[in-house]
Amino acid sequence: MLPLKNRRLRSSIIIFIVFFCLEITGNSASAQNLLHPSLVNRLYKLSGNKLFWFPPGEQSQALRLALKNKVDSSINIGLKKYKYHYNELDRNTAKNFTEEDSVKARQLNKLFSDAAIAYCKDVYQGVGIDSWIKYDEISRKYEDADNTYLLSHLAVVKSANDLVHFLNSLEPVDKEYLLIKNELHRRSDSLSSFQKQQLTTSLNFYRWMHHFNFEKWIVVNVASATLRYYEYDSVKLTMKVVVGKPSTKTPRFAAHCSQVILYPYWNVPASITLNELLPQFKRNPGDIDILNMQLIDANGNIINHHKLNWKIYNKSYFPYRIRQSTGCDNSLGVIKFNLTSPLGVYLHDTDNKAAFRSGYRYYSHGCIRVEEPIKLANYLLPNLIDSNFLESCLKDQVPFPINLIKPVPVFVVYQTAEADVKNVVKYYKDVYGLLR
């Protein structure tokens, strides 16, 4: 056994090592928990490999304090401050370091950079969009440009005023966003937790959609069953839509309208064919003529359905697809707006105009019926839509496709809180139960 003096010395050494390891671990843990480590490294390089937040020998507390204060008040715009390392910011904002503390300074510099980048991205692009959107071909196209924009502007910040000005500039300035933001801040004490969730979700959708600053774009809000057509941040057209039933939900996605088809065929989806039309036509094959439909074989030939033995067909064996001929009694009406998503969902006219008179417009199999398709088409294709041609309701007209020279972004979202055209914040029922 070691002498008492040696045992005490060994214990002191062990305690020192433990505390030293805890100190190092605590500092390095922050680096390991960075939300955007690669972007932090990019910002460091853009800053000339300097300690952006902790420059040696300089009193830079004002810059750090400005970031901490913005993060601290992030609840007012529906964000959660602890996501942005708020506790670490609060503990270290007042610290200054000497050359001997360079390791700690570098670690904290990364932490502050990560907090700033995460805050910028969330204010600029919205939070949690990927959890709502099933398909998004727009965000990934602009992700690199978004990151470059944020980092290049952060890298040239020289003062607290510069930082605050830049962070404020990242928020949308359109009145819809501002109304929702003010509702959340002004009524925070009286709002239920569910209403706060509605407002916060809506703010994030607005941030996401508006930050692209597209020249032309369309928003379909499934929750309100409405469509808005924008030019930059200005709403040019608003109309009702009919969207999917709760059992056949319209998916949320971001794609492009690439083509408008005048007098489209309706190629009936297989699910509708097998579950609805096949049983109906087996009972009464004459309904095919009444509904102006055709059977098409694998080679694209129209089949004479009067000569078929309908008894042999069932869900497991039906070698045809069903197509509805063109005309005003076509389920797609006289205009179809093709979208680039792989989800099989598109915008279209309808032969059932009465559905738009209802306050409850969740009737479709998933596609989106548009109240005023000719108006929308005229905005997308100025001077190319002949209203008389469409309103003539021609029978069996060959479909006439028109490609858009520049495809128009289409966002299909789910905002249960929305600012309407009268500048009133409206709360909608969570018809699909997505917020529960």
Specify the residue positions occupied by each region the protein language model found.
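Cationic-aromatic interfacial patches
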Residues: 32-139
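Short linear sequence elements within intrinsically disordered, low-complexity coil regions
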Residues: 21-25, 58, 89-91, 182, ...
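Well-ordered beta-sheet/strand-loop patches within structured domains
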Residues: 31-35, 45, 110, 117, ...
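Long, highly charged low-complexity segments enriched in Glu/Asp and Lys/Arg with interspersed Ser/Thr
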Residues: 145-152
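Bacterial Sec-dependent N-terminal signal peptides
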Residues: 1-33
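Generic intrinsically disordered, low-complexity segments enriched for polar/acidic and small residues
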Residues: 13-17, 41, 79, 429
